[in-house]
From Swiss-Prot:
Function recorded in the entry: Specifically methylates guanosine-37 in various tRNAs.
Subunit text: Homodimer.
Keywords of the record: Cytoplasm, Methyltransferase, S-adenosyl-L-methionine, Transferase, tRNA processing
Compartments it resides in: Cytoplasm
Top-level taxon: Bacteria
Organism the protein comes from: Chlamydia trachomatis serovar L2 (strain ATCC VR-902B / DSM 19102 / 434/Bu)
A Gene Ontology biological process term: tRNA N1-guanine methylation
Gene name linked to the record: trmD
Keyword flag Transferase: yes
Name of the featured protein: tRNA (guanine-N(1)-)-methyltransferase
Membership in a protein family: Belongs to the RNA methyltransferase TrmD family.
Enzyme Commission no: 2.1.1.228
CC terms in the record's Gene Ontology section: cytosol
Pfam families (UniProt xref): tRNA_m1G_MT
Length: 352
């Protein structure tokens, strides 16, 4: 695999790419990483690469030097990635996907960013390593290289280690132990010493689930959602309890009252209806009002009692034709979903 990194600081990558597993992989020829200086494509005598933006403060990388730098190394099957906090969050799944590419061009951001026209013209995908801002994109490029390199055959001494690491299967890895058997009075779990591979595998899976549920409930719910059985009938869908300590009513404008009522009947149960009024729980009510033209989407906030209800809600919503939106960040079970008329439901789960 070949990777070209475009930045203003090509020397930044020298030491990390010469040491550790990455350095060994490069020496063995399993991976090729080259660092290029965008300034080589700067304009004029002084090789200018940045200028002040029209609509803000600071400096931006200019479109022309960036575009020329990319085109100088881009090939027919190259994939150009811009490291940006606005991009898709890097994951083990994405790293594995990128490891199958033959040639990557990593574009590092500097200053306040890059002229949008360069991104539109040349960038295939934007990737973020987290919801924070760095002084430049060089560190993010190194993170991406390291993350995807682990999935390139021959780079890790034991390829199986990549398969069992945290997040590879959507869960956090469980605790690890080595010799001695007892340290400061604390023993290695007996199951790891029994020699029964199936029991050990079952134990690892269980502690992995427990650790993920405790430390990263967002990942736990995402895993649970992705691996739960597909629900196909109304009988399979038990009543979802909605937490509502206060009285409130919501009016939703819909273009097809019959269709909308059928959707919400299957979501919350036919027994909850009184005419065109839906009782979600106790004093909470939802009114449907048919209109030819809606005044725009309404946002409804709903909190569910358990994480199982949260997952069932999302499964049912998608099965009935609703759309799933963005997943919340920060470890909190939160998801935006859209009904058949485009109204927004912000769904969360009680934190216990």
């Amino acid at each position: 695999m070949e990777i070209d990194i475009l930045s203003l600081f090509p020397d930044y990558f020298a030491s990390p790419l010469q040491a550790t597993i990455l350095g060994r992989a490069i020496k063995q020829g399993a991976l090729s990483v080259r660092s290029r200086d965008i300034r080589e494509f700067g304009l004029g005598k002084w090789k200018q690469v940045d200028d002040s933006p029209y609509n803000g403060e600071g400096m931006l990388l200019m479109a022309e030097p960036v575009v020329q730098a990319i085109r100088s190394i881009r090939r027919k099957k190259s994939k150009v990635i811009y490291l940006s906090p606005q991009g898709q969050l890097l994951s083990a799944k994405k790293s594995r996907e990128l490891a199958s590419c033959s040639h990557l061009v990593l574009l590092c951001g500097h200053y306040e960013g890059i002229d949008e026209r360069a991104l539109t013209a040349e960038v295939d995908e934007e990737i973020s390593i987290g919801d924070y801002v760095l002084t430049n994109g060089c560190a993010a490029a190194l993170v991406l290289v390291d993350a995807l390199a682990r999935f390139i055959p021959g780079i890790l001494g034991n390829q199986e280690s990549a398969e069992y690491d945290s997040l590879e299967n959507g869960l956090l890895e469980g605790p690890q132990y080595t010799r001695p058997r007892v340290f400061e009075g604390e023993s290695v779990p007996e199951v790891l010493l029994c020699g029964d591979h199936q029991k050990i595998a079952d134990w690892r899976k269980q502690v992995s689930l427990e650790r993920t549920r405790e430390r990263r409930p967002d990942l736990y719910l995402q895993y649970f959602y992705g691996n739960s059985a597909c629900l196909s009938t109304q009988e399979d869908l038990p009543r979802i309890e909605v937490v509502s300590p206060k009285t409130f009513s919501v009016v939703l404008e819909v273009q097809d009252l019959r269709k909308a009522k059928k959707f919400y009947s299957r979501m919350f149960g036919k027994e909850c209806w009184d005419g065109d009024k839906l009782f979600l729980l106790g004093k909470t009510s939802l009114y449907l009002q048919q209109t030819k033209e809606t005044r725009g989407p309404t946002t409804v906030f709903i909190e569910l009692e358990t994480d199982h209800d949260f997952v069932r809600f999302l499964k049912r919503w998608e099965m009935l034709g609703g759309e799933l939106g963005e997943q919340g960040t920060g470890g909190f079970p939160l998801r935006q979903v859209f009904d058949l008329d485009g109204h927004i439901w912000v769904v969360s789960c009680v934190q216990k």
